[in-house]
Amino acid sequence: LALANPVHAPYGRAAVTLLEHLGLLRRKDVPLPGLAKPFPLLSWEEIPWERLTGGVEAYWDATPLRQGKPRFAFVYGENISQTAQLALAATRVGLLALSLAVHESLSGAGAYWLASLGSHLPLEQDYLVLKGRGRPEVLAFYVYVGSPEARAVFRRYGFLLPGE
């Protein structure tokens, strides 16, 4: 199963929490030093993801995912785009961003299932200008991103926008 590495990739964290929500992963009672609560009692937002460097199966029991699949394994992408490539080329199944699943380059590659918003760690994305604030082309891009045309593009690729 291809998924983004949850240690540093937000989509990987959403994938793990989705599998947990569906009952396909169960948290192990493993000690994580320095935490106020035991690992199994932490909310998704409280999990110290950057400290979970042992791989998903060091912290979650994947027995439900293994049933009938003796060769089951997690394959980690460094980001969600690499995870999509792994799903296409190697695993044939993965947990991806909707924006990739509906993209023209993947549209004929298979089917996708849309998870409900409450079934995984939410992913909020922002944009900001780091350099060139005074340049006309930077300002034009900033204005475009908030325009009705750009909002239509975001919706087409599965993004929810503020107020939706």
Task: Locate each region found by the language model.
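Exported/periplasmic ABC-transporter solute-binding proteins
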Residues: L1-E164
